Amino acid sequence: MAESAGASSFFPLVVLLLAGSGGSGPRGIQALLCACTSCLQTNYTCETDGACMVSIFNLDGMEHHVRTCIPKVELVPAGKPFYCLSSEDLRNTHCCYIDFCNKIDLRVPSGHLKEPEHPSMWGPVELVGIIAGPVFLLFLIIIIVFLVINYHQRVYHNRQRLDMEDPSCEMCLSKDKTLQDLVYDLSTSGSGSGLPLFVQRTVARTIVLQEIIGKGRFGEVWRGRWRGGDVAVKIFSSREERSWFREAEIYQTVMLRHENILGFIAADNKDNGTWTQLWLVSDYHEHGSLFDYLNRYTVTIEGMIKLALSAASGLAHLHMEIVGTQGKPGIAHRDLKSKNILVKKNGMCAIADLGLAVRHDAVTDTIDIAPNQRVGTKRYMAPEVLDETINMKHFDSFKCADIYALGLVYWEIARRCNSGGVHEEYQLPYYDLVPSDPSIEEMRKVVCDQKLRPNVPNWWQSYEALRVMGKMMRECWYANGAARLTALRIKKTLSQLSVQEDVKI
């Protein structure tokens, strides 16, 4: 607007200057005579070969009248000369081409430069609406937040009150009992599925977290303390609620408890009034996973047999179906690998991470595959899983896939066996054939198309234990799942080997 005003003020000045000069052109036969307001010496008359002009405009608040001559050379552009243009609010200009035709009076321009338009002021109703709207919304948000927090706190305190008032809880959790005593008493006298839910809640809410010992896609694992004993606390992120619920559900299967399956203690959704934590409490094993253990240590022949036999025992118990009123369904792990097997103080294994496991209902011959987005570990997938030929309706198919993965775990263990001072560095299966994080397509090409398996060194034939291990591995890796060994057959073979090698289990 400022630029427009400047340009509009400049034009009248040009007109005044032009008027001062008289606008005279060269005299000639066809010269045009015009009235001239500034031509005192020629009796207010000028002569031109162009046009007569009359203009009235406002400048600095004053009205100015100009009559003058416009030379022909100044009449540009042709048809609409610059000097003949008008502006409704600032100036009124007229050009003509007859002698003294500019002796006319023009309409005075309507006003000065337009002031910038200001928006109209808000009325009282609008002002009230503008102020009251956000204030009301803010109060509404505060009330909703207060009600949500109050609800969570009521639920939290009610749970605490119920736990404190439950006499059976006090009876079970007498102060002279350790965690191990409690788990043993309840698992042997009850259904074999672990602690009652109210006891689980009480235990979980009296655990003191000490240090973080692991992280995964599900969340974190902490070492905690309860009544002088260590426990492992797996804390799931809220988006992994399905995984938490499924794993807790599997662990609480009737008659599941076994010395070679991770001891489940409690599951609880801890609500502290503002957010919910999903806890899964289990036995703590300081050696960590078999993967960590083999990376740190080599093993003797005795140690290798103990690790292999205990892993087979745990898997055989998972796969086994126990018939009866206190029976147990067959369970397939579906994600067996060295990172999901823990090593106990006594050098034995405990199978863990049952979040992907499936149970078989013998009565209806159905499998309860949970709606979980997690998938198994590609490196340990059996050929029939990689090429999608596995029969998902047949429970034995899942057990056969577990056996293939167990064979790979045995290969990891045997490589670290120190026999006659000879051992190999720890490596993952297929380390020399696929990248560190292989795709399903890369694994399928190696395992299904090329039918390759991890290398079994020839020098293992020099040691009976390693020879037996190598033979078992190959029988676990058959492309045809039905031809593979069963977990029970592997357990029996390793039991015989332990007797031959005089291994005390």
Swiss-Prot record:
Q: Where in the cell is it found?
A: Cell membrane
Q: What is its EC number?
A: 2.7.11.30
An individual GO BP term: regulation of signal transduction
Q: Which residues form the GS domain?
A: 177-206
Residue spans crossing the bilayer: 127-149
Kindly list every residue the record annotates as glycosylated.
N43
Residues assigned to the Cytoplasmic compartment are 150-505
Q: How is its activity regulated?
A: Activin receptor type-2 (ACVR2A or ACVR2B) activates the type-1 receptor through phosphorylation of its regulatory GS domain.
What's the protein here called? Answer: Activin receptor type-1B
Name its species: Rattus norvegicus
Gene from which the chain derives:
Acvr1b
